[in-house]
């Protein structure tokens, strides 16, 4: 098997580069110079891959590639939700979807972050997996990290994998306080407020998207931040998903009257709008409705997901 095949299904192997270049060139009518800027390749590389694609049979009248469906989904979702960036990972039976999403998100960040820029990170399994696969890049490019919410435990599976010399600002407070009054006091502490202001000034952010229909598999429930009773009550109020512990309905509107919202310590969802790029990482067909709501609410402007989930999203928005 060639090195190009081994690069992985999550990053940009040569076949995927050919497929993307062909799509942009023949379907979207972009020039080779525009494609080179979009993909971070030289114009000569774009030209050579177009030629190689023709010679190998990948590029014909149609794009003869396993990535074609992913590109079509990407194009449809980018246009429908006005996304800055999107990566749909090809279907791979029996693969660990969380691992694949984390690697895909790491590649997206490596393509967009510049040396010494600031990355804000939300809690959750997908974001922590991303950090694990981004650790070498973070060290080499001196990327600074800041957490978007309180709590040390939820972040340690990812941050604990980083080099000790990495610059990481962790909010010195729990993710959820025991009361609204205590949460208010903690938010006003200088040390907490400073980290929150730093997070708002980030160059990019990465967040997971929870779905209410995950039930006992929801990260926020498994981590002990809400009870099963609270989850049921929140679902009855019309919630379909959450980001950073804030629950929203199918239109992306924050659900009012939710106790946890007053007890969370960290950035509120509307504060994410100050960050130029906010990447949502989520997969699994049960999360499709929550992902749609997150995009409708404009909480994220970039997405990493898998082919089956993207297909489900398109099916739902076309109803």
Curated annotation (Swiss-Prot):
Its main location: cytoplasm. SUPFAM superfamilies: NagB/RpiA/CoA transferase-like. The keyword Transcription regulation applies. GO terms for molecular function: carbohydrate binding; DNA binding. Keywords: Cytoplasm, DNA-binding, Repressor, Transcription, Transcription regulation. InterPro entries: NagB/RpiA_transferase-like, SorC_transcr_regulators, Sugar-bd_dom_put, WH-like_DNA-bd_sf. The keyword Repressor applies. GO terms for cellular component: cytoplasm. Transmembrane segments: none annotated. It is found in: Cytoplasm. It comes from the Bacteria. Inactivated by phosphorylated autoinducer-2 (phospho-AI-2). Phospho-AI-2 acts by binding to LsrR, which is then unable to bind to the promoter regions, allowing the transcription of the target genes. It holds the Pfam family Sugar-bind. Residues 32-55 bind DNA. Belongs to the SorC transcriptional regulatory family. Transcriptional regulator that represses the expression of the lsr operon in the absence of the quorum-sensing signaling molecule autoinducer 2 (AI-2). It also represses the expression of the lsrRK operon. Acts by binding to the intergenic region between the lsr operon and lsrR. In the presence of phosphorylated autoinducer-2 (phospho-AI-2), LsrR is inactivated, leading to the transcription of the genes. NCBIfam families: PRK15418.1 (NF011947). This is Transcriptional regulator LsrR. The gene is lsrR.
